[in-house]
């Protein structure tokens, strides 16, 4: 079986391919949380632990923070929103869609991921990426769409900092969200990409390639904020509050998130 095919099967097994959601039956009985895709592995663990401890379930739907923002403005039936960029939360609050201005729950990081067998090497300062652009080794490189995905916007900023943005644009493959971008970066369909540290930390992703963290002063911070929406049931506040408990934060830290001192 071709290596790229095996990697694709591995991604199907993780449930991280774009569009993966829970069953309609779950939507009818459990409150729905619209969560940024970088949270895929960490938040599933947090929600499972919350369920074990309280007996309460939540439905998690993962996608692009910007797309969720637009959907919520248009009346999408979400009860809680966990964005990878706090500005989307502030805009929803200004539009009267939320109960308040939310709470900062994590700080994210980005890095370069390359699949096993790639001619590209993962290094923090993107030196081999620059060399590959010059010597012709680089054909395709993945980032999330910077127009609506916060991790894509930060990838663009990092590439601009490295002086590579203009040269790399013709080579870019844009993911709809950071999960799809990670699939592109590890499946062999590209030679690598910029993905979330929180995804690279997952064992099922880490085994597909190598990863190097990009300096956090190369881009604006990924200040990730959550908020309850106006129609959130009272029971969902327990999950909202659980996100910032030590039990949940221990899981988040294990996936590479930093915990904010000021919320």
Protein language model annotation of sequence segments:
Residues 1-14, 19-23:
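Twin-arginine (Tat) signal peptide motif
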Residues 24-62, 66-74, 83-86, 90-98, ...:
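Exported/periplasmic ABC-transporter solute-binding proteins
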């Amino acid at each position: 079986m071709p290596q790229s095919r095996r990697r694709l099967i591995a991604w199907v097994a993780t449930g991280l391919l774009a569009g993966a959601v829970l069953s309609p039956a779950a939507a009818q009985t459990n409150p729905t949380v619209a969560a940024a895709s970088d949270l895929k592995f960490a938040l599933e663990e947090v929600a499972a632990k919350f369920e074990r401890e309280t007996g309460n379930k939540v439905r998690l739907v993962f996608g692009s923070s910007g797309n969720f923002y637009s959907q919520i403005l248009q009346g999408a039936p979400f009860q809680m929103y966990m964005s990878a960029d706090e500005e989307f939360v502030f805009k929803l609050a200004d539009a009267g869609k939320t109960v308040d201005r939310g709470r900062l729950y994590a700080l994210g990081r980005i890095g370069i991921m390359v699949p096993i067998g790639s001619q590209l090497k993962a290094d923090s300062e993107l030196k081999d990426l620059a060399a590959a652009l010059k010597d012709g080794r680089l054909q395709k490189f993945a980032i999330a769409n910077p127009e609506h995905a916060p991790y894509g916007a930060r990838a663009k900023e990092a590439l601009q900092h490295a002086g590579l943005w203009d040269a790399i644009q013709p080579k870019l493959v844009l993911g709809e969200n950071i999960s799809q971008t990670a699939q592109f970066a590890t499946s062999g369909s590209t030679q690598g990409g910029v993905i979330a540290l929180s995804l690279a930390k997952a064992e099922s992703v880490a085994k597909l390639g190598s990863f190097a963290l990009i300096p956090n002063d190369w881009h604006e911070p990924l200040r990730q904020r959550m908020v309850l929406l106006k129609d959130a049931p009272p029971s969902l506040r327990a999950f909202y509050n659980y996100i910032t408990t030590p039990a949940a934060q221990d899981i988040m830290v294990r996936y590479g998130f930093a915990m904010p001192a000021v919320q």
